[in-house]
């Protein structure tokens, strides 16, 4: 799931993804936006 959070590093996506999708969620930075996966 792509969320509306800008990023330049994958680590920047972990917190917003966990906040939205729970403790086991992960995140990647793709084209400057965070993509979360369960």
Curated annotation (Swiss-Prot):
Highest taxon listed in the record's lineage: Eukaryota
Keyword list, A-Z: Disulfide bond, Ion channel impairing toxin, Neurotoxin, Potassium channel impairing toxin, Secreted, Toxin, Voltage-gated potassium channel impairing toxin
Site entry: Aromatic residue of the functional dyad: 37
Disulfide partners: 7-29, 13-34, 17-36
Known tissue expression: Expressed by the venom gland.
Pfam (any one): Toxin_2
SUPFAM superfamilies: Scorpion toxin-like
GO cellular component terms listed in the entry, alphabetical order: extracellular region
Domain notes: Has the structural arrangement of an alpha-helix connected to a beta-sheet by disulfide bonds (CSalpha/beta).
Family under the similarity heading: Belongs to the short scorpion toxin superfamily. Potassium channel inhibitor family. Alpha-KTx 02 subfamily.
Protein name: Potassium channel toxin alpha-KTx 2.21
Organism of this sequence: Centruroides bonito (Scorpion)
